[in-house]
Amino acid sequence: FTAAGQEAQYVRYRRLLSGYTVQHVYSAAAYRLDPAMSLRQAADLMLLGGQKSFAVVEGDTVVGFLPGQDLVSALHSSRPFVPVAELMRRHVEPVMPGEELIDVERRMIEEQIDALPVAFAGRYLGLITHDQIITLRRLASAAAPMAPPRHTAANSPAN
């Protein structure tokens, strides 16, 4: 009966997140890292802003991703002055603003990461975290009839 309970919970989660996309919750103000920055500098940003994971960006292009768990592990190995470029994951594809949150959450779980970079037309826009998705789900659950905001030209990623 555990599998049936998990399936029912997944259906409920899917219903709560239905219609919500990345653009509804991602943070455009998230810190980003330059590949030449040291891991120590990345850790300083982690402490300063409470952000766990980071997009690695050159110009406006995402070139990698540094999950918090990778950063902490490297710092425990006494490697604070290693450049971010040596540790970053190079094959983490950014998500787009129009992607459904349920799909983004599933991908985070599968890839075992707590955040993903957000990009549109190859340009870095920000970061979406699993915590943001969980918070939205809790808000939607508390206000069950709450409908997702409508997509308008004013909140489109092109503006």
Could you describe each region identified by the protein language model?
Residues Q69, S73-A74:
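Bacterial c-di-GMP phosphodiesterase catalytic domain signature
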Residues R90:
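Short proline/glycine- and basic residue-enriched helix-capping loop/turn segments at helix->loop/beta transitions
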Residues R32-G50, V56-E58, L75-H76, E86, ...:
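The conserved cystathionine-beta-synthase
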Residues V62-P67, L125-T129:
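Amphipathic coiled-coil signal-relay and dimerization helices
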Residues F1-A36, A143-N159:
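Membrane-interfacial segments at transmembrane helix termini in multi-pass membrane proteins
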